[in-house]
């Protein structure tokens, strides 16, 4: 049998699902007022992609609405990545990755990949700044997001990832996707990828959880 490759979701899988909504989102929202008044050309170009009037008030309202409704918007994700970078670099943000997930990622390097709706930039920052001054990026082979691969609930996204990591469709079952979201697992299953449901404290209940192989700790793999 071929060496297994693992694709990991982030929140609710390798770190608490509360990290994004209780730490990252509030940190970002505190910066929105200054963000919409920025003179940085890169940020201005991103803001210009929002389908609203470009005055500060309209932009502020639109961004807050996207965040509060947890809309997976690619422009928003890029802006968040920029703001979170400042927080990680200043030490204000540290990622609470589960110890068993840290051990798993290190043990299975270089066969671990990350797939999240957050931007690749934000993913790298998270794994560079893990609590305990741990940098996991050297153990992770690659990162995928909605810009590089597509939405996590669409089978085509997983076909795209298989191609990116050099796995032919006939060997898809040698890839294991671990997530707390059953819709994402179903999309991966549709293209033959093996799946595991992550059952972490605080995760949203999955009505048909018995349908999936499941774990509450990576040490069980």
From Swiss-Prot:
Its main location: cytoplasm. Its cofactor is Mg(2+). GO terms for molecular function: acireductone synthase activity; magnesium ion binding. Substrate binds at residues 116-117, 152. It catalyses: 5-methylsulfanyl-2,3-dioxopentyl phosphate + H2O = 1,2-dihydroxy-5-(methylsulfanyl)pent-1-en-3-one + phosphate. It comes from the Eukaryota. The keyword Lyase does not apply. SUPFAM superfamilies: HAD-like. It holds the Pfam family Hydrolase. It is found in: Cytoplasm; Nucleus. Bifunctional enzyme that catalyzes the enolization of 2,3-diketo-5-methylthiopentyl-1-phosphate (DK-MTP-1-P) into the intermediate 2-hydroxy-3-keto-5-methylthiopentenyl-1-phosphate (HK-MTPenyl-1-P), which is then dephosphorylated to form the acireductone 1,2-dihydroxy-3-keto-5-methylthiopentene (DHK-MTPene). Monomer. Belongs to the HAD-like hydrolase superfamily. MasA/MtnC family. PANTHER family: ENOLASE-PHOSPHATASE E1 (PTHR20371:SF1). This is Enolase-phosphatase E1. It comes from Kluyveromyces lactis (strain ATCC 8585 / CBS 2359 / DSM 70799 / NBRC 1267 / NRRL Y-1140 / WM37) (Yeast).
């Amino acid at each position: 049998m071929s060496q297994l490759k693992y694709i990991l979701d982030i929140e609710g899988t390798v770190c608490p699902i509360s990290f994004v909504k209780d730490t990252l989102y509030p940190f970002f929202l505190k910066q929105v007022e200054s963000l919409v008044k920025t003179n940085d050309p890169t940020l201005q170009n991103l803001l210009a992609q929002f389908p609203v009037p470009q005055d500060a008030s309209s932009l502020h309202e639109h961004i807050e609405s996207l965040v509060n409704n947890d809309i997976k918007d690619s422009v928003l994700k890029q802006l968040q990545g920029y703001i979170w970078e400042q927080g990680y670099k200043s030490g204000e943000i540290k990622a609470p990755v589960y110890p068993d997930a840290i051990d798993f990622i290190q043990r299975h390097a270089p066969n671990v990949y990350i797939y999240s709706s957050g931007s690749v930039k934000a993913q790298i920052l998270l794994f560079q700044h893990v609590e305990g001054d741990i940098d996991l990026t050297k153990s992770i082979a690659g990162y995928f997001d909605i810009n590089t691969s597509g939405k996590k609930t669409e089978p085509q996204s997983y076909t795209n990832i298989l191609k990116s990591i050099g796995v032919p469709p006939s060997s898809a079952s040698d890839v294991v996707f671990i997530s707390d979201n059953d819709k994402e697992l179903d999309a991966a299953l549709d293209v033959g990828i093996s799946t595991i449901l992550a059952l972490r404290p605080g995760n949203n209940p999955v009505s048909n959880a018995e349908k999936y192989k499941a774990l509450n700790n990576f040490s069980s793999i």
